[in-house]
A protein has these predicted regions:
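N-terminal glycine-/serine-/threonine-rich beta1-alpha1-beta2 phosphate-ribose binding loop
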Residues: 1-137, 149-162
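A contiguous active-site-proximal alpha/beta segment in oxidoreductase catalytic domains
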Residues: 134-136, 142-181
Length: 181
């Protein structure tokens, strides 16, 4: 069995999380089918473009088949400009937004990846669902049970899917070498 480095584990789980979003109801048993655009690609927007968001942005721009990065959003204009340049280096030209509410008006977006600051996750998730988008949200989805329940109720009400990223870590491995006695 291969011993994974932390970096390999994180890369694998990040790509797996994106694949789970793309797979939609086949993985999580939701009642709403995951619908892409007419050409079969799922058109994705990434919100919050610093560390986690940058990784998601580059994954959807270059690594995930069936996923197409169509929009990016960040309130920091310097970060937004830098990420737009990163996308253009790999041949992707997403629409840019500094206002999340304007992004939600774009009917060409099928799914949203939320990697904004934690305190914005619940409301941005609910707004995304209300706008008819499936949502993949970095942890934490909410700061308390009530917020989490509101997001789940919104997913049911609008027949959309939520995928929340969760990392599980295993306890350190211990050697059980038999004693020589």
């Amino acid at each position: 069995m291969k011993n994974w480095t932390r970096k390999e584990f994180l890369q694998t789980t990040a790509v797996g999380g994106g694949a789970a979003l793309l797979a939609g109801n086949r993985v999580y048993g939701q009642t709403a089918p995951a619908k892409g655009s007419a050409n079969g690609d799922i058109r994705v927007a990434v919100v919050g473009l610093r560390s986690q968001g940058k990784g998601h942005m580059l994954d959807h721009a270059t690594k995930l088949p069936g996923s197409r990065l169509v929009a990016i959003c960040d309130v920091d204009s310097a970060v937004l400009a830098a990420r737009k340049a990163d996308c253009e280096k790999v041949g992707v030209k997403p629409t840019t937004y500094s206002d999340y509410r304007k992004l939600l008006e774009n009917k060409d977006i099928d799914a949203i990846v939320i990697a904004s600051p934690n305190h914005q996750h619940s409301l941005q998730t609910i707004w995304g669902l209300q706008a008819g988008k499936d949502v993949y949200c970095e942890k934490p989805l909410s700061h308390n049970v009530w917020e989490g329940r509101q997001a789940v109720e919104a997913a049911k009400k609008y027949s959309k899917n939520i995928v929340k990223r969760a990392r599980r870590t295993a306890p350190p491995r211990t050697s059980t070498t038999p004693s020589s006695s």
